[in-house]
Amino acid sequence: MRIEYSSRPKLYTRIIIPSKSGSAFQYRSTTCLHHSQKPTWVSSLDLGAKMDPAIKSELEKYGDDVLFRAVTNHTQSTWARTFHSSPELFIQPQSIAEVEKVVNLARRCRRRITTVGCGHSPSNITCTSSWLINLDNFNKILSADRETGVVVMQSGIRLYSVGEQLDAVGLAMPNLGSINHQSIAGAISTGTHGSTLRHGILSSSILELKITLSNGKTETCSPDQNEELFRASLISLGAIGIITEITFQAVPAFTLSWEQTVDTDLRMMNNWDKTLWTQTEFVRVWWFPYTRRAVVWAAEKTDLAPMPPPKSYYDAWLGYHVYHNLLALGHYVPSILPWVEWFVFGMQYGFANGSKSSAIQPSRQALLMNCLYSQFVNEWAIPISKGPEALKRLSSWLNHLTPDDPDYVAHGIPYSAEGLYVHAPVEVRVTETSNSLTPRPHLDPTCTEEATLYLNATLYRPYDMDPPCHARYYQGFEFLMRELGGRPHWAKNFETTGEDIEAMYGENLENWRRIRNDADPEGMFVGEWHRRFILGNGPRLALEEVETGRKKFRKGGVLVEGVVGGFKDEEDEGEGSESGESFDMLRASEMK
């Protein structure tokens, strides 16, 4: 055993335990609250004692030099600090061989594996008490062909790094969502999209994937090779395997000239079927329900020299903190929120209709927006033709409109909005996948018969406080979205039942389940979120993680706890693979 010391006294940085056959195990003890933080090393003469002896025993049997980079005492948090979990091990592989080793070890040790990137999904989809893999150190662009635009990259690379490195060789991603913190694999796996009728969701640009399955083997899939696995893995929700390598179709780097205009929501909706969504290549809208106004952001490619955007109220220190504290005040006095919308809207975009601002920026900057504070986000995809109806009904409900109001429509939402005050804006975006020539993911939420409209109802959590309107607002919002034929964004917060999801996806969901079960028959990549929303009421799987409880977390949100195989009875648990003998039997069977 070799111990390497840090420069700080009495703190150990890592322990390397070589096995008899020369294999290596890199192990650290840390109290990180988020994987983006540097580990805080704790004093311990025997860090290895913190690991399950069965896992240590199995590690020592490996006859290779492939590292197992594991961390204990890690608490994983979503970016919004809505959910937290304490995995048994937090693992950061740096090669496909290391990923395969983690999967093989997990199978022998009867552990579930969850993969996490930046944690920007505010749901509990990545919560685990078992093993958590993060690929932040598996983040290289392996090749980029400027002539063809074909780029091969490791799956842990963040989108901002993709943009920076592609720009250096004259390339760019054809489209981006509102943020670029996600890993490329995480963005693909949840159906990330931008806002344009000339592009589909991010996975539309994927040419090929490599994915490590529960048997420890890495498979290549594409439209021409393993097409069914490819279609299932494009939106895998982390339940099929670990995406390790991505081949992506980039485009020549481009600059966008954008302009945003304040107007009434009535004028915006009257232009809905005319030029609203086709005036430029990229268009998005922020709708403010209480002031009944909208900001229309439109961008087109240009060869003009860059021109920085005007200073944003949100981005200035004073504006950022004033808004944050007004939201916090609204937590206790919700009735001020319509005024907060009017004030902050005016300071950010202008108080008068017709107010404009503009800029010229590289696409990788122009397409982004500041997410500001911790938040819940509930986004649904509906047919674009249903957009005006959706906004008018939501406005009538939130504003308690009566038939004598010229903007009144019957909202039909069977929940009271009395005393309900929400945050703004509602983000309105579009994609077009109905004419796509590329294979559709089985769990693609977009429309097949027409373009897709996304409505994103954001609720901020000022100082990590859940807004009092949260449950009722989303209850009414989701009712409306379901009535209009909508489907929820997989990475966002939603409460729609698994039965509703089955009705929405039908045969596509059945096909996805079949492919998933073939790739991972024991449920190594399955957790409570998957069971609740997409796996239905079928039998629990051997390595499936079951949620056992939730606790209030000391810094806001909830701590989710689970157990692998928690559905088994005591007799079954007594027959699990927790002995060295059973590990050897598993290993022997795999080598046949």
Tell where the protein language model's regions lie, with residue ranges.
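Noncatalytic alpha-helical scaffold of FAD-dependent oxidoreductases
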Residues: 2, 12-16, 25-27, 31-592
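Low-complexity, intrinsically disordered Ser/Thr/Pro- and acidic-rich segments
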Residues: 21-23
